Design a protein with these regions (language model features):
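Catalytic cores of enzyme domains
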Residues: 1-151
């Protein structure tokens, strides 16, 4: 059973309906350093993901608002989110019950979920390196990467 509408598999053709439909993509990234008190601790898995979610959520909400405003500026554009949808928790997403998304006007797919290589993109175009969560340990920083597909 698939958990979130923003995650594959999709009922549309990713190449045709996303990548090939638009003439360019604008990539935006934000580097977020974690406080030392978070990076110096060890975590069990559930705690680690909870701390990560609590740290990232306000930044993701702010950046999502900004990129949705950019969609308004560029007619026919569509934004790509940084990671999973913020509007439902996994247990609440209507995909589990086979019903349509309740937030179709807000839900956006991520670059990764559409097959984009975010790591290579960040290195090549933003001259940065991604850091990843390791077992029991948080990275020094996270990078939130958004995209705007423009007709």
């Amino acid at each position: 059973m698939f958990k979130l509408w923003c995650c594959p598999p999709y009922t549309f053709d990713v190449e045709k309906d996303y990548w090939n439909k638009y003439r360019k993509i604008q990539i935006m990234g934000r580097k977020l350093y974690l406080p030392k008190e978070l990076t110096s601790q060890s975590y069990v898995e559930d705690e680690q993901w909870k701390v990560t979610e609590e740290f990232l959520r306000p930044y993701k909400e702010e950046l999502e608002e900004d990129i949705l405003k950019l969609e308004q500026k560029y007619s026919g554009s569509i934004s790509l989110s940084s990671g999973a949808c913020l509007h439902c928790k996994k247990a609440e997403c209507t995909r589990v019950s086979g019903e349509p998304c309740r937030f179709q006007d807000k839900m956006r797919y991520s670059i990764e979920s559409l097959g984009g290589n975010v790591g290579k993109t960040v290195t090549k175009y933003l001259n940065q390196e991604l850091q990843w969560v390791e077992e029991g340990k948080l990275p020094e920083y996270f990078m939130l990467i958004y995209g705007l597909l423009i007709l």
